[in-house]
Every structure is written in structure tokens, then in C-alpha cells.
Design a protein with these regions (language model features):
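Conserved N-terminal helical subregion
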Residues: 3-16, 33, 58-186, 190-203, ...
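C-terminal helical "tail/cap" subdomain of flavin- and related membrane-associated enzymes
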Residues: 3-14, 75, 91-92, 327-329, ...
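Conserved mid-domain beta->alpha element of the FAD-binding
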Residues: 17-46, 172-173, 200, 227, ...
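Conserved FAD/dinucleotide-binding core of flavoprotein oxidoreductases
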Residues: 94-119, 123, 158-165, 203-293
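Short, intrinsically disordered C-terminal tails of secreted or membrane-associated proteins
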Residues: 497-505
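Cysteine-centered motifs
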Residues: 438-440, 465, 479, 495
Length: 506
């Protein structure tokens, strides 16, 4: 396998095997390469193509992408910075609204991105930095065998049914909600959990509303719609790609469930649920009706498991914590998982101790977040409005006092790992203690040099993790006025610092 930039020769069984080439798997590969750990990703699809619609990247994930060397220009090509997050009642009045990203005081923006284009951006970075053989397409990990002398053997099946094996020091299960790695680790786990809610996802070209980059959720706990732009407006027409998710809780006896977990449907199949949702500032039927179609799937998750680790094997992303999308943080958490796992390897080496440290830090608090999202997550405010006044009101303060609303949202941000103060102050001592700097040309050890700053300014040269070249690039994704200059010696020898992602628990 190619491992350009590592600067050393390693045996195949020293590498880390990653099962799954989704967002979490690719973020893991980029992180491992950044800290000098060789890896190979096995992905079931024969060809990487942009799939999916909109997702949100919370500031805690954008911080990690910045440290991986992704630029603002790159993310602007696949999405837009979010300016506002708002909940609206059935009569079109605001329940709650707050600024997001830099406008809220974060040091990093929040992005709404086209999931498929963002995934391809990660894939292109993996191929460019590590090499074309870094991701083995058409190869699915079906299980694993722990080796008596240490390490692990992954069992591989290709797209034609042929089987093979791959050995490594560790196996990272990033193979999604239907994870084969998790199924072997927890053979008695209950089936996928479905609470009766069905989602229809699509995009429409329309003019953005409110701030022009607002995330808006409206309705009740049994019927709601979310929409936000995932592209910049066309300067000629003013139209942007508006991502929307319509959701209705149905009876379990509905026949659609037997036709599959994921399918493409016509808008006419569900638009009648929202035909009266028209206000002077938004016409929901018109917005949905312009779409060519939608993707229908049940809102599902998995019950938490007591551990994500089995010796040299560990789970990340949806394989570890598939959760309802009510918090808009599934993709973000997968990125944070990868970075915390990498930080643990910087501290403990490519060892089972690193997996244990990662598991200890995240499994408990993220398991609580799964259940919190199952209970509507931040949309719990809409549930409260529905319970107290039926969803319509003249003055929201008469229904839910301002402090109660603010405290509710602050509690969710803390639980999900992106409370402002918690995230903005996380680097500092935490970075110095838990994530020593990586040297692109050396082995990861506890004695690796530490970087004394976590960002570079636009006017200095930085060593890119895209190989050996240096580039005069834009600053990483953070408030540039707070950027500090990296010492020259560190710039010459090190990648951007990998440090503790931090702040994922309340």
C-alpha cells in the first residue's frame, strides 16, 4: 500500500485497517496519515460517487477539518457557512432563534454542505495525500479474527463474492449502521430501532429566506419540516439549492415499510401532509413541489452498546452510535471520533491502549446523546410548544419563558460537544496534554515535538499534509484575527497539530 509522507518502511501488519469509506472512515484515514500511521480503507462500493443531500458540519467538526488542512475555499465549494438556527411554530411565529458559527462567537464556522460533494472532497484528499491504493473499492469487511500474537485479521469479500484476508495492528469499524464489525462484536444486539417516523429528503432551487443561510425547523414532534441552503446563490438568478427534510410519524401498520429502508419516491406521495403549511414568508407545498423527487427512509437508530471496543478492534461513526438526525450532528461526530482516536494513538501508540482511551472518552457520553436525539434532541422545544398550546401562539414567552428556552438549547449544545465556551477554550492545555504534534517524517511516539500554536495565518508558508510541497494558502477555518503564528522550526518539520477534539461530554 502507498503511504507517501510517512518517511519510513513498515510491515503490512503494522498498518491500521479501516472498514468503510464513508465520512468517518475517510476522516480516520486522513488523521492516521497526518500522524504517520499507515492505513488502508476497504469500501464496499465499486465506485465512489456523490450520494446524499444536505448535512450540517458543526463547529467542533469544522475545527477538526481545519486541523486536517481543509481550507475555507474547499468547504465553500461544497456548502455554505450557516448564520442562523431557528424553530418555528405552526402559525409561523418563532419559537427560538440563535446565530450560528462565527456570528455566534465560535472560533470556527458551521457549514451546511451537500453530503455527496463533501464526501468526494474527503475522498479526493485521501487519494491525493496517501495514494490511489489507500481505498480498496469493491471490498467489504465481513468480520475479523483477533490474532493470538497480537493484531487482527480482517475478513474481506469483494464485489464478485471472492474472499480474502488483510492483517494489521488494529481494525477500525467505520462501516455504518449495518456494520458487520459491530454485529460480530455485539452478536446479541437488538435490531435497528424505528420509532414510526418517516423522512422524505430532497432539494429545490429557490431563493434563501431569513438571513440567506438559515437552518429552519417548523412543526410538531409528529409532523415537521427542516430546510436550509447547501449552496451559494447563483449571482444571475439568486437561487440556491435548498435542502429540505419532511417528517411524519406514521402507524407501524403502514405498508411502505415492507418495500425497503431507502427508496426514491415522487413528491405526490407525501406532500398532502403539508398542503396547509403556507405563510407570508414561506410556502411549504410550493417549495417541496418544485423538486423532481425525494428519498424516503425511516428515521432509525441503534440502541447504545456498553463498549465500542473488542481488543484490537474499535467502532466509530454510525457503526458505533447511529442516531436520529434531530441534532444535525451525526457526520460531525464521526469526524470528531476520528480525531479523538488519532489523538489517543499519539499518546499511546498504535496499540489497544489507544483504543481503550478513545472508548473510555466517548462511548458513555455519546450513548447518552443517542437517547437524547431519540427524544427529539433540540426539536424538543417544538414538542413543548405542542404540549402546552397545540403549536400556535401569539407570544412565545407566554408558552415557554425565554430563560427556559435558552437553558434547553444550551444543555443540548453541551451534550453534543459544541457549546461555545467549551469548544473555544478546548485547545490550550488539553491540546498540549492529549495530542502531541505529528511529524510527517517520523514515527509517532510520546516524545513527538509539540506545536505551540494551532493555526497559521494567511501570510506565512505552511507545510501541507498533501505531500512534501509547501504552499501559501488560506488560513485554516477559524476566526483569522485570533490566529497565532506557528514557530518556524515547527512549521518546517510538522503537520498542523493534531490535538484533543475535546468537549464531547457535558
Amino acid at each position: 500500500m502507498s503511504d507517501r509522507g510517512a518517511g519510513m518502511t513498515r510491515r503490512a501488519d503494522d498498518r491500521v485497517i479501516v472498514a468503510g469509506g464513508g465520512i468517518g472512515g475517510l476522516a480516520t484515514a486522513l488523521t492516521l496519515h497526518q500522524i504517520g500511521v499507515p492505513c488502508v480503507v476497504f469500501e464496499a462500493v465499486r465506485e465512489m460517487r456523490p450520494l446524499g443531500v444536505g448535512i450540517n458540519l458543526q463547529p467542533n467538526a469544522v475545527r477538526e477539518l481545519a486541523d486536517l488542512g481543509l481550507t475555507e475555499r474547499e468547504l465553500d465549494r461544497v456548502g455554505v457557512p450557516a448564520k442562523e438556527w431557528a424553530l418555528v411554530g405552526l402559525n409561523g411565529n418563532d419559537v427560538y432563534a440563535e446565530p450560528r458559527g462565527l456570528l455566534a462567537g465560535y472560533r470556527w464556522p458551521q457549514y451546511a454542505v451537500d453530503r455527496g460533494r463533501f464526501h468526494m472532497l474527503l475522498y479526493q484528499n485521501v487519494v491525493e495525500r496517501i495514494g490511489p491504493d489507500a481505498v480498496r473499492l469493491g471490498s467489504r469487511v465481513t468480520g475479523y479474527r483477533k490474532n493470538p500474537g497480537g493484531g487482527v485479521t480482517a475478513l474481506i469479500e469483494d464485489a464478485d463474492g471472492a474472499t480474502s484476508e488483510a492483517s494489521g495492528a488494529l481494525l477500525i469499524g467505520a462501516d455504518g449502521i449495518h456494520s458487520a464489525v459491530r454485529a460480530q462484536m455485539h452478536p446479541d444486539q437488538p435490531p435497528i430501532h424505528w420509532g414510526g417516523a418517516v423522512m422524505w429528503r430532497g432539494t429545490t432551487l429557490a431563493k434563501p429566506i431569513r438571513t440567506g443561510s438559515s437552518f429552519v425547523g417548523l412543526g410538531t414532534h409528529r409532523q415537521r419540516i427542516v430546510f436550509y441552503p447547501i449552496s451559494h446563490p447563483d449571482p444571475r438568478t439568486g437561487l440556491a439549492a435548498i435542502n429540505w427534510i419532511a417528517e411524519v410519524t406514521l402507524d407501524n401498520s403502514e405498508g411502505w415499510k415492507q418495500s425497503g429502508w431507502f427508496r426514491q419516491v415522487g413528491v405526490g406521495d407525501f406532500i398532502h401532509h403539508f398542503d396547509t403549511w403556507v405563510w407570508d414568508w414561506l410556502d411549504v407545498p410550493a417549495l417541496i413541489g418544485q423538486a423532481d423527487g425525494a428519498f424516503e427512509n425511516p428515521m432509525i437508530d441503534r440502541d447504545p452498546v456498553p463498549t465500542w471496543r473488542d481488543g484490537p478492534v474499535v467502532l466509530i461513526g454510525d457503526a458505533a452510535h447511529a442516531m436520529y438526525p434531530t441534532g444535525s450532528n451525526g457526520g460531525s461526530q464521526a469526524i470528531v471520533d476520528a480525531r479523538i482516536l488519532g489523538a489517543a494513538m499519539v499518546e499511546h501508540g498504535v496499540t489497544q491502549a489507544a483504543l481503550a482511551a478513545y472508548n473510555e472518552k466517548l462511548c458513555g457520553p455519546i450513548s447518552k446523546l443517542i437517547l437524547r436525539n431519540r427524544g427529539a434532541g433540540p426539536f424538543g422545544l417544538l414538542n413543548m410548544v405542542d404540549e402546552r398550546c397545540g403549536g400556535t401562539f401569539d407570544n412565545i414567552d407566554d408558552v415557554i419563558p425565554a430563560k427556559e428556552r435558552t437553558d434547553f438549547m444550551a444543555g443540548y449544545r453541551a451534550a453534543a460537544g459544541f457549546a461555545i465556551e467549551q469548544l473555544n477554550t478546548a485547545p490550550g492545555d488539553h491540546r498540549a496534554r492529549h495530542a502531541r504534534a505529528c511529524r510527517c517524517s517520523g514515527r509517532v511516539t510520546g516524545a513527538a515535538a509539540r506545536l505551540t500554536a494551532r493555526a497559521v495565518t494567511p501570510d506565512i508558508r505552511r507545510t501541507s499534509c498533501r505531500g512534501d510541497r509547501t504552499e501559501r494558502g488560506r488560513a485554516p477555518l477559524r476566526c483569522r484575527r485570533r490566529a497565532t503564528r506557528m514557530p518556524l522550526a515547527s512549521r518546517r518539520s510538522s503537520c498542523i497539530a493534531l490535538r484533543q477534539a475535546g468537549g464531547t461530554s457535558p
